[in-house]
Amino acid sequence: QNRRDFLKTAALAAFGSGLVARQALAGESLLSTIHINKLGLGGKMKMTFFPYELKLRHVFTVATYSRTTTPDVQVEIEYEGVTGYGEASMPPYLGETVESVMNFLGKVNLEQFSDPFQLDDILSYVDSLSPKDTAAKAAVDIALHDLVGKLLGAPWYKIWGLNKEKTPSTTFTIGIDAPDVVRAKTKECADQFNILKVKLGRDNDKEMIETIRSVTDLPIAIDAN
């Protein structure tokens, strides 16, 4: 049974078993107006996208450059009045640009597919449009999964049968900066992440580590570039 059939079966089972009602009672945000006959049986998907500039809370500095913004392109896929959101983020070292992402997304035609539950078919089609453009492809992928999750009324960890308490740890990156800024950044993230990634590569490496250690004993990963 492929993923498309699984999702349609899951959709019918979720609504038929009262899963949505139980989640609603638990206080989760659900699309209670979605009906079974809207799940994979009609309508067309509409994709829109636009560029925007993500403004960073702090200047982000590594050994070779600093930046205060990250260029992004937001993708929205609408189906039956429900919208899924995704984005392509293009930090300078990835080699993609707003222009390249916009050009790729302009080639994507989702209206040829009958519904968003055709995940495998849609993503295979998107991937076939270019051997590169991974950020642009990821934006469509994320928006599509967001849309399907909303139509099912459940987060993806539940759809996949995963335990959110076993989510692998990820890092928060602290860029090179003055001690007071590094201290502030560390305080902001210390209770939200299990590992800190620290950018090094200048003359203040020791000072960076000592400043972070004055705030927290969290494990530190070093990224010197």
Where are the model-predicted features located?
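N-terminal secretory signal peptides and thylakoid transit peptides that target proteins
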Residues: Q1-A14
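A general lysine-centric signal
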Residues: K8, K137, K197-K199
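C-terminal segment of N-terminal export signals and the immediately downstream linker at the start
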Residues: V20-L56
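Short helix-capping/linker segments at secondary-structure and domain boundaries
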Residues: R22-Q23, D146-W156
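N-terminal amphipathic alpha-helix/helix-capping segment at the start of soluble metabolic enzymes
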Residues: L39-G43, V62, A154-E165
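Metal- or metallocofactor-binding catalytic centers and their adjacent structured scaffolds
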Residues: L39-K44, F49, Y65, I77-E78, ...
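Short catalytic helix/loop segments, enriched in acidic residues and glycine
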Residues: T68-D72
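Metal-dependent enolase-superfamily TIM-barrel catalytic cores that perform enediolate-based chemistry
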Residues: W156-N225
